[in-house]
UniProtKB/Swiss-Prot annotation:
Protein name: Choline dehydrogenase, mitochondrial
Keyword Flavoprotein appears in the UniProt entry: yes
EC number: 1.1.99.1
GO MF term (any one): choline dehydrogenase activity
Length: 599
């Protein structure tokens, strides 16, 4: 279904349903806080400058402007998530099923690529990242997964004191408004609408039944007591529309006179006086401008842009900066290091019944799906179709799940940039705590040049063995009786791939990013030479500068990254405002009865 509206005209008209919803937004009154520019010679100050209106930046813009004494400037390199020149929502972003349209389009997307990967047969991988209001929450598959409680306890052990599960859970709950209501794990009053998968599609039902037949439990809530098992996914979809952080946090704050939100604005460097951050320099409409702060500059550009901007500003490995002629403000060798991502592989089967999303690519069917969504926000356009999934342990002795599954009643080829070839279904499966760690470095001093990105995929034997398990365990699930009415031939990797050597070769040839880069501005103790920010999210070695986004994770979590990134921003906002930390939430968390078996 990801291919449904790739060929639709950008001049599509919006009927009453879409217009009525879009009209709920209110225009922002003019802000008196004029941005200082090189041309004017002015020096207007803001309390905070937030760089990046993405998953974290939108949260911060909202929470910081709750205090009317805070004047906040929010700078986004990309455009608004609205139709050009109007207040109407851009359907390409807000229609859940149209997500591939943005993965294929650099208008809202940084369109990064990695360096050639030796562990993946020398392939260069495509890394889409959001460049629009909402950031990657406006491009992603809308899957809301927090990870496992032990991910956050591990952060605490790695030096991010106060970021254990008991101290993070309250901020997951603060952000969330779950359609099923609040409990000890879920939030019920937050701005982020979260819904639960509810499709009756026979292939989703077969997937859940097959997992049970293979001996895995059903879990009622992957974000609650028990992550381990298979069940219905939570999604950031509300009333048939994508619910990004732009919808949840930014739009409600735009009417505040103490918030100025600029788009099409590329920040080129942080301005320093000595080691104190005093503002930023940015490019807009081809002109250089400067804006200044009385308190702090906050980088929320994500795991690629935030370390890139730090290095462009003179904060990073001094030897690397000197080679490019960048004056060193602070030698901080951890900047851009510790890069972690989730890798995944698609296991695909032909379907013997015409019930997959293949038919949705037919021109007339596309029109019908699009019109139903535009009119009512219902139908196949109102979901990304990744409504079931699961988490399991790869082998005995693993304490909590390290493999994740997303099921899709369709076939994905080249990130959805190529149409499906036939009736088919697939599982996205991958490991969640790889031991391979990468890096990113500046390619040049030009802020418009993408940095060198080296995830170092499959560089350890452990990671190769874990992916071998991913393939074998997925095949076992697909072989269960529940899929018998639908099971055609295995399309990928194909029945001819059987030996460990053949499976390894398949993984190296076909594995791809799950789009979860993180950890490049690691949070830790100031005494840790690899740390970039402290437990308060302050950049070590300088003043008045923070990083708040997925880059500060000490290690990648066991699941998708959007929910944890929003949590990080909520928690950091309280730190900045000096609010008392929300109370400990010591809730029960499932543990396997034995680690002697894999399930």
């Amino acid at each position: 279904m990801w291919q449904v509206l790739r060929s639709w005209s950008k001049r599509c008209l919006s009927p009453r349903g879409a217009l009525a919803w879009a009209a709920q937004g209110q225009p922002r009154p003019p802000c008196s806080c004029a941005v200082a520019s090189a041309a004017s010679g002015g020096k207007d100050e803001y309390t905070f400058i937030v760089v990046g209106a993405g998953s974290a930046g939108c949260v911060l813009a909202n929470r910081l402007t709750e205090d009317p004494n805070h004047r906040v400037l929010l700078l986004e390199a990309g455009p608004k998530d609205l139709l050009m020149g109007s207040k109407r929502l851009q359907w390409k972003i807000h229609m859940p099923a149209a997500l591939v349209a943005n993965l294929c389009d650099d208008k809202y997307n940084w369109y990064y690529h990695t360096e050639a990967q030796p562990g993946l047969d020398g392939r260069v991988l495509y890394w889409p990242r959001g460049r629009v209001w909402g950031g990657s929450s406006s491009l992603n598959a809308m899957v809301y997964i927090r990870g496992h409680a032990e991910d956050y306890n591990r952060w605490h052990r790695q030096g991010a004191e106060g970021w254990d599960y008991a101290h993070c859970l309250p901020y997951f709950r603060k952000a969330q408004k779950h359609e099923l209501g609040a409990n000890m794990y879920r939030g019920g009053d937050g701005p982020l609408h979260v819904s639960r998968g509810k499709t009756n599609h026979p292939l989703h039902q077969a997937f859940l039944q097959a997992a049970r037949q293979a001996g895995y439990p059903f879990t009622e809530d992957m974000n609650g007591f028990q992550q381990e098992g298979f069940g219905w996914m939570d999604m950031t979809i509300h009333q048939g529309k994508r619910w990004s952080t732009a919808s949840a946090y930014l739009r409600p704050a735009l009417s505040r006179p103490n918030l100025r939100a600029e788009v099409q604005t590329l920040v080129s460097r942080v301005l320093f006086e000595g080691t104190r951050a005093v503002g930023v320099e940015y490019i807009k409409d081809g002109q250089s401008h400067k804006a200044y702060v009385s308190r702090e500059v906050i980088l929320s550009g994500g795991a690629i842009n935030s370390p890139q901007l730090l290095m462009l500003s003179g904060v990073g490995n001094a030897d690397d900066l000197k080679k490019l002629g960048i004056p060193v403000v602070c030698h901080l060798p951890g900047v851009g290091q510790n890069l972690q991502d989730h890798l995944e592989i698609y296991i695909q089967h032909a379907c013997t019944q015409p019930i997959t999303l293949h038919s949705a690519q037919k021109p007339l069917r596309k029109v019908c799906i699009g019109l139903e969504w535009l009119w009512r926000f219902t139908g196949d356009g109102a979901t990304a179709h990744l409504e079931t999934g699961g988490f399991i342990r790869s082998r005995p002795g693993v304490p909590h799940p390290d493999i994740q599954f997303h099921f899709l009643p369709s076939q994905v080829i080249d990130h959805g940039r190529k149409p499906t070839q036939q009736e088919a279904y697939q599982v996205h499966v991958g490991t969640m705590r790889a031991t391979s760690v990468g890096w990113l470095k500046l390619r040049s001093t030009n802020p418009q040049d993408h940095p060198m990105i080296n995830p170092n995929y499959l560089s350890t034997e452990t990671d190769v063995e874990d992916f071998r398990q991913c393939v074998k365990l997925t095949r076992e699930i697909f072989a269960q009786e529940a899929f018998a009415p639908f099971r055609g031939k295995e399309l990928q990797p194909g029945s001819h791939v059987q030996s460990d050597k053949e499976i390894d070769a398949f993984v190296r040839a076909k594995a791809d990013s799950a789009y979860h880069p993180s950890c490049t501005c690691k949070m830790g103790q100031p005494s840790d030479p690899t740390a970039v920010v402290d437990q308060q999210t302050r950049v070590i070695g300088v003043e008045n500068l923070r990083v708040i986004d997925a880059s500060i994770m000490p290690s990648v979590v066991s699941g998708n990254l959007n929910a944890p990134t929003i949590m990080i921003a909520e928690k950091a906002a309280d730190v900045i405002k000096g609010c008392p930390a929300l109370g400990d939430e010591n809730v029960p968390v499932y543990k396997p009865q034995t680690l002697d078996t894999q399930r």
